[in-house]
Each structure stands twice: as C-alpha cells, then as structure tokens.
Regions:
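Hydrophobic alpha-helix/TM-entry signal in multi-pass membrane transporters
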Residues: 2-7, 67, 95, 138, ...
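Juxtamembrane intracellular "pre-TM" segments in multi-pass secondary transporters
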Residues: 1, 180-214, 402
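Hydrophobic core of transmembrane alpha-helices in multi-pass small-molecule transporters
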Residues: 8, 90-108, 217, 301-317
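Hydrophobic transmembrane alpha-helices of Major Facilitator Superfamily
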Residues: 12, 16, 104-112, 221-225, ...
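Hydrophobic alpha-helical transmembrane segments
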Residues: 92-103, 125-183, 250, 302-305, ...
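Hydrophobic alpha-helical segments of secondary membrane carriers
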Residues: 6, 39, 132-140, 215, ...
Length: 402
C-alpha cells in the first residue's frame, strides 16, 4: 500500500513537471521544434549513459533505499527552477541541465521499483501488483496534467515545479514507511562489467524476452516521437492553451486507468500472447485520429480526447501484461539487470526518437511527422505477432507455447 501511494504521488508530480517543462520551453523561452526535441531527449538520455550499470548496482543494493535517494535528488533539482525564475536567471540551458539530472534519478528509481515489486509480492500476485502500480501511473496522467494545467493558469509555469517537488516529498515519505522485509541482496565478487555482461547474456538467451526486447525498443522510438509532437500539435497548430493541453491529456488517462483494472478480463479470455498483440496494435492505430483532427478544428479537442482515451486503454493492458510476463520469467537475482536492460531499450532509444521527431516536424510539418511515427509504432506492434511471446496461450509465466 505504501509503495502504491508513493508511486501515485510521484507520477502526479512527474506529469505536472512534464507539462510545466513544455509550457516553459514553448511559451516562456520560445524554444524551436528542434530545441524542444533536444530537451525531451535529455530527459531520457540518462538511460543510455547509466542504464545498464544502474541495473547491476540495484541488484547489489536495497531497492527501497535507492528509491528514497533518487527522490531526494529530484527534489533538489526541481526547486532550482522556480528559484532561477524568481532571480530572473532562468535559461533553456538551465532547463536542460535539470532535465538531465531528473533523468539520471529516474533511471535508478524506475529500475529499483520494478525490481522491488517481485520481491515483496508472490509470483501469483505480480500481475495484480503491477496493475495497481499502473493504475497509479494513470491516476498521475489523469490528475497531473489537469492539476498542472489549472496551476499554470494561475501561476507562472516555473512555479509549478514547487508542486512537483512536493509530490516527491510525499512519495519519499510513503516509501520510507514501507515495513515489508526486503530480502538481503545477493553479494557477488564479480566486477560491474561482468555483472552487466551476465544480464545481457540472460536476456539474449531467453527465447521469450529477447524478441520482445527488440519490438519494445522499436515501439519506444516511435512513441517518443508521438509524445513530443502532440504538445506542438495542440499548442501551435491548433492554438490551444496549456490548460487545454493538460485537460486533454488527463482525459486520455481515464482509459489507462480502466485498462489497468480490466486487464485480468483480457488475460482470462485471450491469454497473454493474443492480449499482447491485439491491444498493442489497436492502441497505436487509434492515434492516427490526432493529426487528422487538424482538418476538423471545431471538433479537434473531442477527437484528440476520444483517441487518447482509447489508445491509453489498450496500451495500458499491453504494458502491464508484458511487464508482468518479464518479471515472472526472471530469477530474483537478475531482476535489476533485466529491468535495466529493458529500460535501456525503451528509454535509451527515446532521446533519439524525440530528437528525430523534432527534426522531421521542422522539415515536413507536425501532421506529416505524426503520421510517420504512428506508422512506425504500428509496424513494431505487428512484429510482436511473430515472436514466441505472442504464442503464449495461458495466463501464467510458464504457459504452453504452441
């Protein structure tokens, strides 16, 4: 319960901060499309720099302490933004430095918490635990942008970071109060490099994980592009306000919350394999409606909202399913490294996807760029249909693969 509460607070703060960053860069610092793509890339660049070592370190350390330390670092970095704004010294470079620090902290927090869940929940309940944490993420998506949009309507965008810092304080307090005993990390005399190589060899040799790893990496590249283009579509092409953007994103998260709750129904009726394929492809296809809304400006807000709700619903079912499958397959001593490798695949390619999306949008226009990146995401989803994971007919981690 404390982990769930802490993650809910952290996700709300993250979403408020993400909206504030977009608003500051676009409206206050007047950043170009390319600069916005670079700023978004810096927030995930840390996974390329320390993603793999972080997994090995987390396997050596107590996960709860790692999460607390990461939160304290984020709090310190976040409070520098409103301070610089008050002193009239806020620059795009400062914003980029903070984004990089937040990215580094997020690497350790995310790897630790994904590795912590299987240690405090039995394998039978890993799916339920992940569903609850994903519901927290969707609560953050639903409440964060709306709260952030409302806040940015009454205070300057840089001051919104104070609320983000406050949510990380709440998250730290909740995690600190967890009393479930954490198993002592397995001690190893192996070097850091040897442990990283062991983790890579495990994923590479696992016939379900490795093909899934490749498809997830490709999908993450495309999703990063879509994510950086949507605020440009809403704020610049459709001339909506930051408040409206926040409300649109919040509405979309309702679908994600419902997806986290109804995932067991999908698994019971379709099994893991077909659930992975169907929900991923549908979840990406409906995004096509968002750039198409340019041609119906009077209905654009409704089109983007409905598309966001549907996409979030299906992709949440998919994400919880693939995450739970990975955790059930992986032995406990490898959890940190396995999660770090997948995070490396997802977040490591996202800086490239974000940056490329900014360049493509600058040359072809936002609408064409969104169509292109949506097509890439669909291709990645179709590829999953040809992996061993798609042939899992059961609802457990040791199913029969036909």
């Amino acid at each position: 319960m404390h982990l769930w509460a802490g993650q809910t607070a952290a996700e709300i703060g993250f979403q408020v901060g993400a909206l504030a960053t977009s608003a500051i860069a676009i409206s206050l610092l007047h950043a170009s499309e390319t600069q916005i793509g670079l700023l978004s890339a810096l927030q995930t660049l840390a996974f390329l720099l320390v993603g793999l070592p972080a997994g090995a370190w987390v396997d050596r350390w107590r996960k709860r302490r790692v999460m607390i330390a990461a939160n304290l670092t984020r709090i310190t970095a976040l409070t520098s933004i409103p301070l610089a704004y008050i002193l009239s010294s806020l620059t795009l470079v400062h914003l980029m430095v903070v984004a990089t620090i937040l990215g580094l902290s997020t690497v350790f927090f995310d790897v630790a918490y994904q590795s912590y869940v299987p240690l405090i929940a039995s394998k039978r309940y890993i799916g339920a635990a992940n569903g609850r944490l994903e519901a927290s993420y969707q609560v953050g998506l639903a409440g964060g942008p709306g709260l952030g949009g409302w806040l940015l309507g009454i205070v300057a965008a840089p001051l919104g970071y104070l609320l983000t810092a406050a949510t990380y304080v709440a998250s730290t307090w909740a995690i600190w109060r967890i009393r479930t005993p954490e198993p002592t990390p397995v001690r190893s005399d192996a070097t850091l490099g040897a442990q990283i190589r062991e983790g890579l060899a495990f994923v590479r040799g696992q016939r379900i994980l490795y093909p899934l790893f490749s498809c997830i990496a490709a999908g993450a590249f495309a999703s990063a592009g879509i994510r950086v283009l949507l605020p440009l579509l809403v704020l610049r092409t459709l001339s909506m306000s930051a408040t409206q953007l926040g409300l649109l994103l919040s509405a979309g998260a309702i679908g994600g919350f419902l997806g986290a709750l109804t995932r067991p129904v999908w698994i019971a009726h379709l099994g893991i394999g077909r659930t992975l394929v169907i929900t991923n492809i549908i979840g990406v296809l409906v995004i096509v409606a968002q750039p198409a809304s340019i041609h119906a400006p009077g209905m654009a807000a409704w089109i983007i909202t409905v598309s966001g709700v549907a996409s979030s619903y299906f992709l949440t079912v998919y994400n919880v399913t693939q995450m739970s499958l990975r955790q059930e397959i992986c032995p406990p001593r490898m959890l940190g490294r396995m999660n770090a490798i997948f995070r490396f695949a997802v977040w490591g390619v996202m800086p490239l996807g974000s940056f490329v999306a900014g360049i493509v949008a600058a040359h072809t226009g936002i609408e064409a760029a969104m169509y292109l990146f949506t097509a890439l995401a669909v291709a990645a989803g179709v590829a999953i249909a040809f992996t061993p994971a798609a042939r899992i007919r059961g609802s457990s981690a040791s199913p029969t693969i036909s």
